[in-house]
Structure formats: C-alpha cells, structure tokens
Design a protein with these regions (language model features):
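Accessory "access/gating" subregions that flank catalytic or transport cores
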Residues: 1-78, 94
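C-terminal catalytic subdomain
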Residues: 58-169
Length: 169
C-alpha cells in the first residue's frame, strides 16, 4: 500500500518553482550585463575627461549565470524523467500496461522513450559541470583569471536542446 507519492510527484511545484526562480535570476543578470559598459578602457569625454582601465569586461557574472541555468534546467530534466519512468515502469505505474504497450511482452511500447530521456539527462549532467571554475591563464599571464563564460554558454545551449527533448517525451 502506497502511503505517499514519490518526490518527483509531491515535490514538483517546489522543484519547478526553484528552476523558475533560478532562470528569473539568470534573466536579471543577463539584462544587467546587456546594459553595462564593458569596454576597456572606459573613456569619459568632456570637461573632466578621463580614461580608466578597469575590469568591467570580465565575464564572471555571465559565466556564473550560465552555470546556474545549466544546473537548474538539468535538474528539471531529471525530475521529469522520474515521472516518465513512473508512468512506464510496470513495477511502479499502478497497474498500467508495461511501458504503455498495447501488447506488453511482445511490444516494447514507450520503453525507448525513457531510455532516450535517461541518455539525454546523463549528457546534461556531464555538461552541467561548471565552466566558471575552470579558469586557465591566457595572453602570457596578463589574463590570469578568465571566466570561461563562452564555454558555459555553448554547454548551456546543448543542455537546453536536450531538456527540450526530454520535456517533449
């Protein structure tokens, strides 16, 4: 006798809400960075003209945001796959045909859909490893702490494509 539903069912609003909150935070970072001055040096013309070298170009805010989004949407895919499994798995789907097959045993039904979801999520989990922590000095050491934000953005794009497929399943 089932006393409680699995976390993937009971905690869906909390996890989906946390993912939404993470993505809203990321959107805020992207908006802030899109409106910021990132040139180096910054040139301030006028009576009190000034040329200031600084670090506003550093990609840490974007890199952290890409990593955060990657982790959040990967987890969204993970909890989604758990619900796919609960629907298809004859051991836990409360009497539905195995893999929702018309003729269980002779037909594999939607079994491959769950396998595809699991494979996509596994790749997302690998890709969700933060890029921002992987700084490697460049430019003869002058750029000794780089954000690796482009790597994070490229990985995030691939993760989002995989997550879209999982959600489609």
């Amino acid at each position: 006798t089932r006393v409680q539903d699995a976390y993937c069912l009971r905690c869906m609003p909390q996890v989906h809400g946390a993912v939404r909150g993470a993505l809203e935070h990321v959107a805020g970072v992207l908006e802030t960075e899109a409106g910021s001055a990132t040139d180096n040096p910054l040139v301030f013309p006028g009576v009190d003209a000034a040329v200031i070298s600084g670090g506003n170009f550093h990609g840490a805010p974007l890199s952290y945001a890409f990593d955060y989004a990657a982790i959040a949407v990967t987890d969204l895919a993970g909890i989604t796959e758990r619900r796919i499994d609960r629907l298809l798995n004859p051991d836990i789907n409360e009497g539905l045909p195995a893999f929702l097959a018309m003729d269980p045993g002779l037909s594999s039904g939607f079994m491959i859909a769950q396998i595809v979801a699991a494979a996509l999520i596994n790749e997302c989990q690998v890709l969700a490893h933060p890029s921002s922590t992987g700084s490697i000095p460049t430019d003869g050491g002058k750029e000794d702490h780089v954000s690796m934000g482009m790597t994070g953005a490229i990985k995030l794009r691939q993760i989002v494509e995989h997550v879209e497929r999982v959600l489609g399943i």
